[in-house]
Amino acid sequence: MGEKMKSLDKMIKERLYAEVYEVLATDNFVYSYENLQKAFPKADSMQYYCFLMYSISKEETPEKHLAVCNLLAFGEPLLDDIYTLINWHINRTLSLFPAFTPIKSFAVYIFFHCPVSPISEGLLYEYALSVLQENPDDSLSKELIDEFESKK
């Protein structure tokens, strides 16, 4: 790991989010959960979450919301009711960026067949239809659509 990344890793652990944000902005950092893990391998989920929320407060993008959703779904547990937070980020993203299909695909992946899904089957069906328009080979969206339509 280069000295710059070691320094950033230390800064994020010290909660110097503004400084980290500025460095990443000048480097045209691409926000994703995977890229955060690579950039800050020693950070924990709470540090990622706090940094992402700071970053969203500076510039709200759908990619940052998707990174938060992936963190909440696949990172170490932060809270008891993560589905509520994930749903909030999905709704927020789609209210600002309605054509952002990756978050719809994420919702289908996480909440299809989830017994405690905060998203209705009807809305997941709409998301799946949208995903298929962009990615006709998405097998999970096809499965959701077939299952939903067979119940009609």
Model-derived regions: residue spans:
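Well-ordered, non-transmembrane segments within structured domains
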Residues: 64-93
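Alpha-solenoid repeat scaffolds
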Residues: 46, 62, 78-82, 100, ...
